[in-house]
Amino acid sequence: MATVSMRDMLQAGVHFGHQTRYWNPKMKPFIFGARNKVHIINLEQTVPLFNDALAELNKIASRKGKILFVGTKRAASEAVKEAANSCDQFFVNHRWLGGMLTNWKTVRQSIKRLKDLETQSQDGTFEKLTKKEALMRTRELDKLENSLGGIKDMGGLPDALFVIDAEHEHIAINEANNLGIPVFAIVDTNSDPDGVDFIIPGNDDAIRAINLYLTAVATTVRKGRSQDLAEQAEESFVEAE
């Protein structure tokens, strides 16, 4: 399982919070102090909290659990997609559509439409249409791929959410809370930690910090999944004997 050290976090700037005037008092237990009117996060808390979160995500992955990575702001968007793809998991990296979890039935219909359009774009159907109709369907396909492409193969609700920026993704967190899905989240000094089951206090804006979190989570999930695959192989080997 991947673990992250204090040095890794310092180098990535995980300890830099937001300006003191934007703070959320609920984050007080995780704040070391302030420097130049910027809150400094106490990494002596962040390191064990993050490593505990990684251990739990490893367990979920080893039980074939589905993990949904959520990060829709510009600084996180591309990295979230890459991290989720690298460990065969799922992601939302553009806009979170209200009801994405709580109204899964409707989302499933949109995913079906997305897959139908994908098939049409590949089997020559688009070429038989008028230019205008083909353009309209291409636009619809692009729009659906943008919003649902990262969850089109999820096949049901996820077993956990890993969120970059609890404040920005509060709608996703509320939906997960309503459904009892555990939430792992990077929570900066301006954010409300309520509703986050595994709080990871840290900088949620710096690209280096975001990459550090995502790389560690993706590595942990991959290892958890390979444990599961190794156990499956062992079981089938025993059965064959």
UniProtKB/Swiss-Prot annotation:
Source species, domain of life: Bacteria
GO terms under biological process: translation
An example Gene Ontology CC term for this record: cytosolic small ribosomal subunit
InterPro entries, sorted: Ribosomal_uS2, Ribosomal_uS2_bac/mit/plastid, Ribosomal_uS2_CS, Ribosomal_uS2_flav_dom_sf
UniProt keyword Ribosomal protein, yes or no: yes
Residue runs in coiled coils: none
Keywords: Ribonucleoprotein, Ribosomal protein
NCBIfam families per the UniProt record, alphabetical: rpsB_bact (TIGR01011)
Stored HAMAP family: Ribosomal_uS2_B
Similarity field: Belongs to the universal ribosomal protein uS2 family.
UniProt name for this protein: Small ribosomal subunit protein uS2
Origin species: Sodalis glossinidius (strain morsitans)
Gene label: rpsB
